[in-house]
């Protein structure tokens, strides 16, 4: 992308599309004083763990500075933070609380994305990786073995167990093959729709966080909103199936919110390019027209690597 078309770092004005509690969190993230507590070493880009304090309120958060982003061949430099904020805006417009409150602001090391920290629920090694009737790991010889939250490995010679959806075959230590599955979970299904909308090219298992009170969040949305089809995800279990009625209703709300000169469109225009805003609207329209979950296109790897 030529330099003039790149989206420069800058502040975003966040009109409250979330319920009041989330709105107060975005005010805290936007106006609070950031203090860096440490760096998350396993992240591919510079990710700092911080606390933010504003008007007597304190919260933990993640700060990803634009200057710490690694160059990518297919995304313009210095735009990943803006894409993370755009993903939050779109998720809020859908009416789903699947992405933690996220803002664009100045930080101790320059402009970047600041996102509320999510405390992930501890998962015991023997627990099933998903809810809703999934068999217990070890219940029988073909039962799924959890590999992370909402993901599991199952017998490659059998269909996906009840309560799980097949993703594909995976090599396991020792040279064997297992069936990688994800939970047949309504929260994951919403996230699959969101990923199709924002054209997420990196939905890995490690980007799924569950909380002690049963909420699900997706994180790491920097490689999104490309104008070309780059959907790459683990959540293919519903491919080709009709969209749930609640997803169709949410997409209809989003289509309305993306109207010309609408507040959401104005906010997105400060975060991604005009062509990317147009492509976003086209994807929403295509999902509504088809009424089904997308299927892998074949021109782009369908599953990210590593998947978990």
Could you describe each region identified by the protein language model?
Residues 28-173, 177-178, 193-200, 212-219:
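Conserved ATP-binding subdomain of kinase catalytic cores across diverse folds
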Residues 180-184:
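Helix-boundary and loop/linker segments of multi-pass membrane transporters
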Residues 211-308:
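C-terminal catalytic region of ATP-dependent kinase domains
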Residues 22-27, 31-37, 199, 284-298:
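Short loop/turn hinge sites at secondary-structure boundaries
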Residues 198, 205, 223-224:
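Short, glycine/acidic-enriched loop or turn micro-motifs at the edges of active sites
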Residues 206-210:
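Hydrophobic residue at the +6 position relative to the catalytic HRD Asp in the kinase catalytic loop
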Residues 1-31:
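Juxta-kinase regulatory segment immediately upstream of eukaryotic protein kinase catalytic domains
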Residues 186-191:
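Alpha-helical scaffolds flanking conserved acidic
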């Amino acid at each position: 992308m030529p330099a003039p078309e790149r989206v420069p770092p800058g502040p975003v004005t966040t009109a409250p599309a979330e319920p009041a509690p989330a709105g107060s969190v975005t005010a805290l993230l936007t106006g609070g004083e950031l203090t860096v507590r440490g760096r998350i070493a396993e992240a591919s880009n510079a990710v700092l763990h911080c606390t933010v304090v504003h008007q007597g309120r304190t919260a933990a958060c993640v700060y990803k500075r634009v200057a710490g982003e690694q160059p990518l061949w297919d995304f313009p430099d210095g735009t990943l933070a803006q894409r993370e904020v755009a993903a939050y805006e779109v998720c809020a417009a859908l009416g789903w609380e699947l992405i933690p409150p996220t803002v664009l602001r100045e930080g101790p090391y320059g402009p970047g994305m600041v996102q509320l920290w999510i405390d992930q629920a501890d998962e015991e090694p023997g627990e099933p990786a998903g809810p809703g009737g999934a068999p217990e790991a070890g219940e029988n010889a073909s039962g799924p073995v959890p590999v992370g939250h909402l993901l599991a490995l199952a017998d490659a010679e059998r269909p996906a167990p009840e309560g799980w959806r097949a993703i594909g075959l995976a090599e396991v230590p020792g040279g064997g093959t297992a069936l990688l599955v994800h939970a047949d979970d309504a929260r994951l299904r919403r996230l699959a729709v969101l990923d199709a909308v924002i054209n997420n090219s990196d939905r890995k298992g490690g980007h799924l966080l569950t909380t002690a009170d049963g909420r699900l969040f997706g994180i790491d949305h920097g490689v999104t909103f490309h104008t070309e089809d780059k959907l790459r995800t683990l959540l293919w279990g519903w491919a080709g199936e009709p969209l749930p009625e609640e997803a169709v209703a949410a997409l209809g709300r989003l289509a309305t919110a993306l109207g010309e000169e609408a507040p959401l469109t104005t906010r997105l225009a400060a975060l991604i390019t005009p062509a990317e805003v147009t492509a976003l609207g086209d994807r929403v329209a295509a999902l509504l027209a088809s009424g089904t979950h997308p299927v892998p296109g074949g021109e782009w790897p369908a599953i990210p690597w590593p998947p978990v």
